[in-house]
Amino acid sequence: MDLQQIGPGLFRWAAPHPEWSPGASPGSTADWPQEVGSVLYEAPHATVLIDPLLPPERESFLRELDKRLHRRGRPVTILTTIGFHRRDRDELARRYEASTSRAKKNLPAGVESFPVRRAGETIFWLPEHRALVPGDRIIGSPGGGLRVCPQSWLRYLPNPLTIAQLKQAMGPLLELPVERVLVSHGEPVLADARRALSAALA
């Protein structure tokens, strides 16, 4: 089970997305790296999976995940940042009898949600680790750092935002003491992430 430990009880893993295709034009709807990230957080009273996608070695991964969850003995919660990231949520929810609600009242202690108005996304905040977990609206920038998603990623919305409007909608995230941003697309920012976030939203 190839987990990258971000902090005590906080892990990230990457897996190739089955719908990825090479040669995408920059700024297009397919402009993202082949591997996408998922997060495992051992919250005080639950084990939380965010946007989980099983890797190609799924059976061995599941065996190790079974062991980890059994050892913890906590309920499992699976959270989805955006509809496109349902990924293997339903299979894992059945396997672990997990909650999939992201309503604020149902979130486990240690997890907060920040719906991005009109953007179809909920970004999760893990205060213990000062970590943000976005879906498609904040992504890794080539060469490091962060950027907002391309305009093309917003076209499907009923009332599409401009990039300027999207940045404004995410402005309140800068009020958080962010140290890490665990993006799904691209490389996570694990230090000085507030500076990177501020630059992305400028």
Predicted feature descriptions by range:
Residues 23-25, 59-65, 141-146:
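A short, polar/proline- and glycine-enriched secondary-structure boundary/capping micro-motif
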Residues 56-105:
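Active-site metal-binding motif and surrounding structural segment of the metallo-beta-lactamase
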Residues 34, 58-61, 85, 117, ...:
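Amphipathic coiled-coil/heptad-repeat helices and related helical stalk/stem segments
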Residues 11, 99-101, 112-114:
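General small-molecule cofactor/ligand-binding pocket signal
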Residues 1-45:
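Zn-dependent metallo-beta-lactamase
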Residues 109:
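Active-site-adjacent helix-turn-beta-strand microarchitecture at beta-sheet edges
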Residues 2, 15-19, 46-56, 112, ...:
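Metallo-beta-lactamase
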